[in-house]
């Protein structure tokens, strides 16, 4: 999922196991809203938890969402076939057990428990048949539509998903898939209420309209009671939820704001119980000194990406454009960013697929040999190598006598980011790094939803990026960049008339398709390494560090995992 500043595991905790959350309230600790405290307690009512995750979500439609903040809200409102427990183990949710799998591992049979929508109607296997086909339909234009490519197709183009009775699903895959159970736990695979969807959008022109206001039918632990856009959301316990007896928190109040100074002040005043980001200049004060402040591991990569179709590369060959991007990659001082911006022990990244990710064949994908550059070197260590790459792209340099150079012709660009002190600080670090070779970079910050749309549409030269693994398999990182992926912000292979300087992406698309369809898991690992090689050779993706995550949680809030 597109990364803000909250971990996917913590999303599961806040949205799924907040149902098991309890609190022992006390008097709020006194604070001026800016000082770090040893610990603090909540002043919200006993039956409520108040949190901030982000600003206004772009969508809370399970089929359309591809951001973590939207995902958190979706798992409040909806329940799928499977979920994860506090140890990260996959367990049944609306399924009665783990699926029965055929000997050739291509046919999955899932038995369902009886459960209800929030309006009292039964949730049936046909709800999943409808919802999965809707998410996969090109008319829906879901960023994650490709997650259904592993499912075979019927002659009419529909997914080979059949409701053999009201509570049994039969799913036929194109080939064995080691992570299909995890897909069935992912929000894009959640059911939606067909009548709401079709009533709100009878012509199919606005597929997410049905959930743009509170009051829609859902089947999760909570229903959305109120939504003051760009201000707040209130979720209330759903009495029709299949496990309602174990939902002890009656309400979840969400503050919608990307202003980390304001949300941090609200947290310190006791108005918020949980925040997933703090002002960047507060991290060193909090880390190791405040028991509310937590750092957790994560599986994902923070990176910076180029739009390969941007005019900055006009007139260059494919190789020259790649050399320009690779040169700037070498200039990045990752150690500085980790130590002075991230400040929570992130690991500098020398590959796109993150360290620790499984290879899908019983091993770990990234080894000591899997590095594309020396991430420990600072930009000043690699200025000469970067200069040679830019010279090969047609640029000349004049030594300024202070370790920096003037570039001719001049290179100017704008770094696109959302409003967040950490991302802006990363941009400021890049400004200094690129200036070593006379490259001028401005910083443009936008509201979250505007930023997402501009980045997706290719309205940028260089942008901040991040991806948290949706499941523990490298294909999840690599299939982002296929031509038909809605998450391919780098525009690789995209556009009616791709730039002459953009790489031909045909072979990459074929490679990802082969990875998805091969039944030889050892070969699959080799193919995924080839795909990462091809991706990194474009220079369009510049990994900065492998994620961990931070959050603050009131000391008297219990039961969160």
Each model region followed by its residue ranges:
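Structural transition elements
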Residues: 5, 348-395, 399, 419-423
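N-terminal lobe/hinge region of extracytoplasmic solute-binding protein
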Residues: 52-101, 217
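Ligand/substrate-recognition segments at binding pockets and active sites
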Residues: 229, 379, 393-469, 521, ...
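Ligand-site clamp/hinge motif
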Residues: 213, 239-285, 440-442
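Gly/Pro-rich hinge or "lid" segments in bacterial periplasmic/extracellular proteins
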Residues: 86-89, 185-247, 251, 269, ...
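Surface-exposed binding/hinge segments that line
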Residues: 145-199
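Aromatic- and charge-enriched surface segment that lines or borders ligand/interaction sites
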Residues: 96-142, 170, 266, 318-320, ...
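Detector for C-terminal structural segments
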Residues: 331-366, 422-431, 455-561
């Amino acid at each position: 999922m597109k990364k803000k500043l909250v971990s996917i595991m913590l999303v599961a905790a806040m949205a799924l196991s907040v149902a098991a959350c309890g609190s022992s309230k006390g008097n709020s600790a006194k604070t001026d809203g800016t000082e770090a405290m040893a610990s603090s307690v909540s002043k919200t009512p006993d039956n409520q938890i108040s949190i901030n995750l982000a600003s206004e979500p772009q969508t809370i439609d399970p089929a359309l969402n591809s951001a973590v903040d939207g995902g958190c809200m979706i798992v409040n409102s909806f329940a799928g076939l499977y979920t994860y427990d506090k140890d990260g183990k996959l367990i049944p949710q609306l399924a009665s057990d783990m699926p029965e799998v055929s000997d050739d591992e291509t046919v999955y049979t899932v038995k369902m428990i009886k459960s209800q929508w929030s309006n009292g109607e039964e949730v049936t296997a046909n709800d999943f048949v409808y919802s999965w086909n809707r998410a996969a339909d090109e008319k829906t234009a879901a960023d994650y539509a490709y997650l259904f490519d592993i499912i075979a197709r019927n002659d009419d183009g529909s997914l080979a998903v059949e409701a053999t009775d009201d509570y049994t699903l039969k799913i036929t895959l194109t080939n064995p898939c080691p992570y299909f159970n995890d897909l069935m736990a992912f929000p894009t695979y959640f059911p939606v209420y067909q009548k709401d969807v079709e009533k709100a959008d009878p012509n199919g022109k606005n597929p997410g309209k049905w959930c743009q206001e509170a009051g829609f039918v859902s089947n999760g632990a909570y229903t959305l009671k109120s939504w003051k856009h760009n201000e707040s959301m209130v979720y209330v316990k759903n009495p029709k939820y299949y496990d309602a007896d174990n939902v002890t928190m009656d309400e979840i109040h969400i503050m919608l704001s990307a202003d980390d100074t304001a949300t941090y002040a609200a947290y310190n005043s006791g108005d918020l119980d949980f925040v997933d980001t703090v002002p960047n200049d507060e991290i060193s004060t909090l880390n190791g000194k405040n028991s509310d402040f937590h750092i957790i591991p994560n599986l994902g990569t923070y990176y910076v990406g180029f739009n390969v179709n941007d005019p900055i590369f006009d007139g260059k060959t494919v190789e020259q454009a790649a050399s320009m991007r690779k040169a700037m990659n070498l200039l990045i001082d990752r150690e500085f960013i980790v130590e002075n911006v991230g400040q929570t022990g992130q690991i500098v990244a020398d590959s796109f697929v993150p360290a620790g990710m499984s290879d899908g064949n019983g091993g770990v994908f990234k080894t000591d040999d899997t590095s594309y550059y020396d991430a420990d070197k600072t930009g000043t260590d690699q200025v000469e190598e970067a200069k040679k790459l830019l010279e090969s792209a047609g640029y000349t340099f004049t030594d300024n006598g202070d370790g920096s150079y003037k570039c001719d012709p001049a290179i100017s660009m704008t770094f696109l980011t959302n409003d967040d002190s950490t991302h802006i600080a990363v941009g400021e670090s890049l400004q200094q790094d690129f200036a070593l070779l006379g490259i001028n970079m401005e910083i443009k910050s936008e509201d979250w939803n505007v930023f997402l749309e501009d980045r997706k549409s290719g309205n940028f030269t260089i942008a901040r990026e991040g991806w948290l693994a949706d499941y523990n398999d490298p294909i999840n990182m690599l299939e982002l960049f296929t031509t038909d992926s809605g998450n391919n912000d780098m525009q690789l292979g995209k556009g009616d008339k791709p730039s002459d300087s953009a790489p031909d992406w045909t072979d990459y698309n074929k490679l990802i398709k082969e990875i998805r369809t091969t039944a030889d898991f050892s070969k699959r690992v080799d193919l995924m390494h080839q795909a990462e090689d091809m991706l990194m050779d474009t220079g369009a993706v510049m990994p900065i560090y492998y994620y961990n995550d931070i959050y603050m949680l009131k000391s008297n809030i219990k039961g969160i995992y």
